[in-house]
Amino acid sequence: MNKFLNKKWSLILTMGGIFLMATLSLIFATGKKAFNDQTSAEDIPSLAEAFRDYFPIGAAIEPGYTTGQIAELYKKHVNMLVAENAMKPASLQPTEGNFQWADADRIVQFAKENGMELRFHTLVWHNQTPTGFSLDKEGKPMVEETDPQKREENRKLLLQRLENYIRAVVLRYKDDIKSWDVVNEVIEPNDPGGMRNSPWYQITGTEYIEVAFRATREAGGSDIKLYINDYNTDDPVKRDILYELVKNLLEKGVPIDGVGHQTHIDIYNPPVERIIESIKKFAGLGLDNIITELDMSIYSWNDRSDYGDSIPDYILTLQAKRYQELFDALKENKDIVSAVVFWGISDKYSWLNGFPVKRTNAPLLFDRNFMPKPAFWAIVDPSRLRE
């Protein structure tokens, strides 16, 4: 017997204004409260298949997820993979010249065996990067150097290390990976000039960005696509700083093919319209757009509470309706969005269970038992929802 969604809207007055909150009771078709009682796991439609006429559907993966029950989830529901951590600099080259390929290779092999596309994340970042990159020849932090001549020597050394690293990585994977996050999270509106004040920037200015893209193109050739990736790209201030950076780089002939919009959002913010506005703005530069790290926290950013194992039905329903709104908008803009990649596949292993605080979060389409949530049905088969 099917169970359905019932909605009841209550108007809540606050000192700050009036807002509408859905007091919703969801009885859906999955898991304990959301599955049609007659539906088996084998009858659940493929997420990737549902979007075959729009764009590939991807998910971040760890090497340990390539076997077992969770591996079956990836095989059925996505046709694109990205390494959540295994291809970051600290994982691939913990010390200079000491490359550790095994975990990344395992993900590449899993993708090839299952006919999946791959994205690379990420060649350059301010986090999860060995400190050795920015140490001088004597092992001292380059950022602490004050002598102009030595600073110039350090700049050249850092950029040479960057080129060497990129060349080694790209040459290894260019035949298997066609979509590359070259630089990640270089914009920080609160830092001087809007550029993140990382060691990369302190030592080279924006030159490291240019060098990274040129080195990647040189090693990988014209068949691979190169992206600049960041979070909160919907925020008008951050978006415009990123836009001007990319525009200036393109004018200098830097080979950038697209923008990666991480899209770590929550069930309340940001408005979907802002996400689409940003995508359209970068498309105006002739660039591709990818949703690269999609998830949707059930908590607002400033909320540090924890539902534990008792997430209210109305919260899951809000999430479902918001995912539906987002995907409807993305489908309408399929000509300028080439892929949508989730940052994980099951709530059980989401990074948001530990960030910004340790708690139970549920940002993805599959629950801790690997069963589809209301959000899954909202974007795959909205007929399962009833007003």
Swiss-Prot record:
One GO MF term on file is: cellulase activity
PROSITE patterns in the record: GH10_1, GH10_2
Q: Which UniProt keywords apply?
A: Carbohydrate metabolism, Cellulose degradation, Glycosidase, Hydrolase, Polysaccharide degradation, Xylan degradation
Record flagged with keyword Magnesium: no
| InterPro entries in the cross-refs | GH10 (IPR044846), GH10_AS (IPR031158), GH10_dom (IPR001000), Glycoside_hydrolase_SF (IPR017853)
Q: Which residues form the GH10 domain?
A: 41-382
Catalysed reaction per UniProt? Endohydrolysis of (1->4)-beta-D-glucosidic linkages in cellulose, lichenin and cereal beta-D-glucans; Endohydrolysis of (1->4)-beta-D-xylosidic linkages in xylans
Q: Name the enzyme group at the top EC level.
A: hydrolase
Which residues are responsible for catalysis? 185 (proton donor), 293 (nucleophile)
UniProt pathway: Glycan degradation; xylan degradation
**Activity under varying temperature:** Optimum temperature is 80 degrees Celsius.
Lineage, top-rank taxon, reads Bacteria
The cysteines covalently paired via disulfide bonds are: none
Q: Which GO terms describe its biological process?
A: cellulose catabolic process; xylan catabolic process
Question: What is the pH-activity profile?
Answer: Optimum pH is 7.0.
Q: So what does this one do?
A: Active toward xylan, carboxymethylcellulose, P-nitrophenyl-beta-D-xylopyranoside and P-nitrophenyl-beta-D-cellobioside.
Protein's name according to its UniProt entry: Thermostable celloxylanase
Native source organism of the sequence: Thermoclostridium stercorarium (Clostridium stercorarium)
